[in-house]
Swiss-Prot record:
UniProt-annotated stretches for the region Disordered: 29-58, 273-298
Keyword Secreted: yes
Protein name: Allatostatins
Source domain of life: Eukaryota
Signal peptide interval: 1-27
Modified residues (Isoleucine amide): 364
Cell compartment(s), UniProt: Secreted
Modified residues (Leucine amide): 73, 94, 105, 117, 161, 172, 188, 200, 213, 232, 264, 353
Any one of the GO BP annotations: neuropeptide signaling pathway
Tissue specificity statement from the Swiss-Prot or TrEMBL entry: Brain, subesophageal ganglion and corpus allatum.
Molecular-function GO term, any one: neuropeptide hormone activity
Amino acid sequence: MSGPRTCFCLPSALVLVLLSLSTSALGTAPEPSGVHEESPAGGGTDLLPHPEDLSASDNPDLEFVKRLYDFGLGKRAYSYVSEYKRLPVYNFGLGKRSKMYGFGLGKRDGRMYSFGLGKRDYDYYGEEDEDDQQAIGDEDIEESDVGDLMDKRDRLYSFGLGKRARPYSFGLGKRAPSGAQRLYGFGLGKRGGSLYSFGLGKRGDGRLYAFGLGKRPVNSGRSSGSRFNFGLGKRSDDIDFRELEEKFAEDKRYPQEHRFSFGLGKREVEPSELEAVRNEEKDNSSVHDKKNNTNDMHSGERIKRSLHYPFGIRKLESSYDLNSASSLNSEENDDITPEEFSRMVRRPFNFGLGKRIPMYDFGIGKRSER
């Protein structure tokens, strides 16, 4: 016999069974192929397709954006659907070749930026012989030629190792073919223009600025190269040897120092000073001969020594006159005192710092013979 509790449980169990059956039936039902969303207007629903189902033909803009971001290592971005053409703007990667941006090692790029190691301009192909011809050819460049050089693309920006640029041919042993570069031929062994030919072993046409080692100024008077004969082993070419030969004709000895004025800080004798020194030496030599009873060798030697300024260290002021030097062994000089003999021997080699001459008797530790 059933009680009231069992009567209440049976209906509740039936309700639960029905609910479970209804939910299982709803889960097995197929869903529609769209998404139900309310329209912005308010009523009804629309079915919108998923983004995955879109094709390239339905949305071409999406395909173009996809092509622009096809980067990577060795990637090739294509600008056409056929995928046989390369995109020249975004062709990046390792080993890529692009005409506008071909930078890197061993790249061959446009003419505007030919940088790198051992690069060669495109404008110089087949023009190696023109450099040698222009180096030997005309010295002046016409305005049209300068314009042609400036119009060339790579000649102004051809930098690197082994580059050849015509307007700026600097360095060691460079040869500038253009006439504008003749004034600035600097370096070692350069041969430049006449006014600024500096360096070692230069041969300058400018007579006022012929500096260097072993320079020989051109003989053209005192106003050009006579007052500035600097260097080692200079030859003063502006001395009138005829006048000197007439002055020393009676002694038959020629002043050899006038041909080779060596040393630093040489001073050329002016005509007025030359005459004054010559007169002074004649007076001093006569007084000296009366006191010491010596030959004319010393007076002639002192005259030659005073005509120019033999400054320097260990200078050989004048050469021996063998005919007069032999008089030392003659019978006339048997009674010469040791002091006079040492003075006679010391005169040909009067060396030291600060030579003494009749007008300028200065030096360090010098002994004046007068």
